């Protein structure tokens, strides 16, 4: 497994600011957590379900090729960083429900 973080410099309110992804041996997404500027979190894959929201296309071997100066930066992160974010996402309501908590 590999873990990556995409950070968007100027997201709109309905676009994720940070996207944490877990990739399998074929560089396909198996789990993802999206953090939005307004504080919402969305998690996909594993116990959160919604696998159809995961990227069907494999990520490039060198994720730095996804970097676009002034728009998005991509980098590999440690497995523990992803697990911490994943666990936090599991403890939070996501989407519409977070308005009530």
Model-inferred region functions:
Residues 6, 21-24:
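N-terminal phosphate-binding or glycine-rich loops at protein starts, especially the Walker A/P-loop
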Residues 24-68:
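Acidic, aromatic-enriched beta-alpha/helix-loop junctions
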Residues 60-101:
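Short, compact, well-ordered microdomains
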């Amino acid at each position: 497994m590999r873990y990556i973080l995409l950070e968007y410099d100027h997201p709109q309110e309905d676009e994720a600011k940070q996207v944490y992804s877990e990739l399998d041996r074929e560089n396909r997404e198996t789990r993802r957590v999206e953090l939005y500027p307004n504080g919402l979190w969305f998690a996909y894959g594993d116990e959160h379900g919604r696998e159809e929201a995961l990227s069907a296309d494999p990520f490039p071997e060198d994720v730095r090729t996804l970097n676009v100066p002034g728009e998005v930066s991509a980098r590999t992160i440690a497995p523990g960083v992803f697990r911490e974010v994943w666990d936090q996402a599991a403890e939070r309501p996501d989407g519409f429900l977070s308005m009530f908590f």
